Every structure is written in C-alpha cells, then in structure tokens.
C-alpha cells in the first residue's frame, strides 16, 4: 500500500489534509485512514454541532463523564467554539467516521476515526483498491474578538490551593520475570516505605512459589497485594489469614472483568479482603460495570494509542479524570490502580498475539525512557493527577528492578545500546519515590501552561515538573524556578494559609 498526503493552508482560515492511497497487493485491514483528535482540556463538556453523513444536523456536546461507547456516530462534520467569537469546524470525507472517548484508555483526547466498529472486520483490500480521504479544519468568526489567553512575555505560573487531600498509598510490583532481589536492592526498596508490593500468581505457580515471593516482600517491609491471575484460590488455602498479605485480587487474564462469584469464593477460602475489577483498563469497568466488591482494581498505561513524548506526558492528566469516574462507579469500594506502567503489558485486543510484535528494538513491554528523567517527570504528573482527585486509595507503579523497574540490576541492561542504563544504578523514578516516602497529604495546584510545567505539592514541598524537552522557567510560591528538560526541582512552599 502506497500513499501520498497533501497539506494545504489558506488565508481564509481553512486547513486541508488529503490522502490518496492504492493497494498493490492483497491484505486485511481493520481501519485504514485518517484520524482527528480533539483535546480534552479545551472541549470536555462543551457544546458542539454534529453533521451526520445523511446531512442532518443536531446539537450535541463533548462528553464530560467518560463515555463507554461512541459519543458521535455517522459523522460528516463537527463544529464548536474554540474562543469567544471563533468557531472551528472539522469536516471528514471519503469514509464514515465516528468517535471514541479516548479517556477510557487514559489518552487526553476524543478520537474521530474510520471505519465504524459496527461494520464487519477485518476487510479484504485487493490490488488496485483506492482509498481517498480529506479532513478540513475551518476557522470562522470575528478575529478581532479573539484574545490570546497569555502573552508570550508573561511568565508561566503555578497557583497552589489551600485544600488538602490524602496521598494514596504508593506501591510497586515484584519483578514479574522471577528475579530474586539482592540485599542491596532490598535495602533501597525498604527506604521507600512502600504501601504495598504486588505479586502475581498464575496457574503455573505453587504455594511454595508464593512463599518465596512473600519472603521478598516481607524483607522489603511492605504488605503484599497478591494477584491471582487465573490461579485457583483453593490451591492457596494454606495462606488463609496470612498477616503478610494485605489483600488479594481474583483475576483471570482470559476474562476482561473479574467474576464476582469467583471473588466471593476466594474470600471464603483465603480469609482476607479479595478484590475484583479488571486486569485491563478502566474501559472494561466503564463498559461492563461489574458488581462492586469491597476492593476494585484496574490498570493504566499512557501508550495504548501513541508513544511520542508529548502525547505520553499529556496523557498523564487523564488519570485524574479516570479516578473520579471510577469513584462515581464504585463509591463504597476501596479503589486501587494496579499496575501503572509506561508501556502496555500486552495487547488485550490482539486476535493473533504472536504477530503483535514490538514497534521498537526492545520487547513490547519495555520503554527505553524508563531509566531516564522522562519517566520520573511522567510519574510525578501521574501521582499529581491521581492524588489531587482524592478518589484512589492505592497505586502500584512499575516493577522493582530491571527494564520495567526503579533501578538497574547489577548485571546491567541486556541491550545496553537500546536501554542505556548503568549496572546497579537507581533510575530517576526511584529517587522521586524515595523523596515521596512517607508522604501524607497533597495540595492541588494549577499551572497556567500544564503541557509545559506543573507541580505536585506534598507535605509542604513542591515537586516542580518540566514536561518538555526544552528548558523552562515558572513562577511558583513567589519565586522563579528554572528547569532543565524533564527535570524535577523541589522547593519548600509550606502548608495552607
């Protein structure tokens, strides 16, 4: 399949993107064409006008709460006000488009895509088949009535509120590849004063395997969250009432949401709090709405759809929206996000997982940025979004060591060219969690330019975050803070007035 694209901008405020493609060999497709993203921060809950493919025009609005389905269908055009006196219209031709609320997967966007999911797929594409699509963006209105939100000469600012919310408990995963922690690694992890350590038990694991995991979590000094990933709860009855285990999750990776009957059975045989929810994303909870358990869980990663630096950073803010929506669904449950990872752990929608190969030189679960300041900055933004929501009880971040962890192992990276870590070194994200050890309260704050700089305010200390690859300066608590790319700078800001 070969294609050509054409971009055209006109003085009258119209921007057009055209694509022409032709198949030279047969293949199967799910979707093939253009996508349009509307940003969440500027459009959530805002009124819009939708034009359908049959020409009918209806008033509507961008969803405020996360929509589990498709909020806009049979789309030809969508228009909304972007500033007083200025209106934007996106027109889509060549296919039938519809919209997903991408916040379900923690993206900071609504996505307009083709082909509609309701149509059969995959679709056979034959040699000579032509695909032509056009997306146009038209701005209309009185330019004189539109004022810039900030002047380029004005400094970026962060304003701290007097409100306080509890810090959720922060935990990690024990390494899922079976790595046994060294004494030095255990010492470092003990210094984090973790709320919990997550371990995963599959049908391949025996009670002796779980005991070996518990020896490590006990050495770290943190309670254990045990995930039964398809394992029979009855096989682990010997751990009934084990004080090293705070709670269990009864999942089956072959089923998108936990069966409440399985959760109740596990509670009976294990004598502890057992939770349900989903092994996957908030999407599954939002769509299936399983019955509440005392503990409900779901996972998050920012790269279900896009992996560029800017998208990943922007997606962190959506975790706060997810947290609030999850609390609305389960007002009385203990809510845990577990785990949060940089990359997807697997593709739950792959019909042939063996063909779902990595898009980088590293395994698909591994992100080369894990050992860089980027991961620490992103994690600080993630903690900010979740903590400020006041809706989540605990969060599991990453693994203990290695490619998906907080520190490099003494043997170093298996692919040092692609994952440029130093053997035995703690990653910047470790230092962030160490600085947050024992944290109790968070004060929400607001940045004038949150895509560039933001802050996490914890127990009288501001963790000022640069979310970009450029140096930035920001005014906070009466002082100017200069930040290197993806840097975190801490300053004292005191408590509420």
Annotate the PLM regions.
Residues 1-24, 101, 106-109:
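Extended, loop-rich substrate-binding clefts of extracytoplasmic carbohydrate-active enzymes
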Residues 12-95:
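Polysaccharide-binding surfaces and accessory modules of carbohydrate-active proteins
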Residues 79-155:
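Beta-strand-rich recognition/accessory modules
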Residues 128, 338-428:
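Aromatic/acidic polysaccharide-binding cleft in carbohydrate-active enzymes
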Residues 170-225, 243:
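Catalytic domains of carbohydrate-active enzymes, especially glycoside hydrolases
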Residues 201-239, 257-273, 314-316:
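Aromatic-lined substrate-binding rim segments of carbohydrate-active enzymes
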Residues 250-373:
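Noncatalytic carbohydrate-binding groove/subsite architecture in carbohydrate-active enzymes
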Residues 447-477, 486:
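Carbohydrate-binding surface patches
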